[in-house]
Amino acid sequence: MEERGDSEPTPGCSGLGPGGVRGFGDGGGAPSWAPEDAWMGTHPKYLEMMELDIGDATQVYVAFLVYLDLMESKSWHEVNCVGLPELQLICLVGTEIEGEGLQTVVPTPITASLSHNRIREILKASRKLQGDPDLPMSFTLAIVESDSTIVYYKLTDGFMLPDPQNISLRR
């Protein structure tokens, strides 16, 4: 793979730096990944995320990495990408277990900063995406490190008791 030295923006993304991604990793050091040089750039889901025209290349890149992790490693079902233009976010909506309700996953690079107000806005938007107003407001934050490690945190509005089936007895 050849590293590109130009900084022309990719359609649908703003502010790309050398390597196709800006501001991801340690101190602005971008991965040497350029969509036109990699198989990712031709993947239908990546192209669908680019067409949303939300955020920059970093956001599309981390959303695509989380999509691949959910589909390939975690075996989620029917994961779709949804753009939230008012929040400038790409969200993933799918089901962890077939037949269960939709869950919202919000991919974010580790360098991003989230305020309480921003989290509240995302909670409200995720309720609309889940389609059931009776469910408690929640979403899963997928934090992507520069080495592609992904950590998932479930955020809810208030405290949630764990499922009894997920609690192991300790003596």
Swiss-Prot record:
Free-text tissue specificity from the UniProt record: Widely expressed. Highly expressed in testis and uterus.
Per the record, the major location class is nucleus
Name a biological process GO annotation. mRNA processing
Q: Which domain of life is it from?
A: Eukaryota
Q: Which family does it belong to?
A: Belongs to the SEN15 family.
Q: Where is the composition biased (Gly residues)?
A: 14-30
Q: Source gene? A: TSEN15
What is the name attached to this protein's record?
Answer: tRNA-splicing endonuclease subunit Sen15
Which Gene3D superfamilies does the entry mention? 3.40.1350.10
The subunit field of the Swiss-Prot or TrEMBL record says: Homodimer. tRNA splicing endonuclease is a heterotetramer composed of TSEN2, TSEN15, TSEN34/LENG5 and TSEN54. tRNA splicing endonuclease complex also contains proteins of the Pre-mRNA 3' end processing machinery, such as CLP1, CPSF1, CPSF4 and CSTF2.
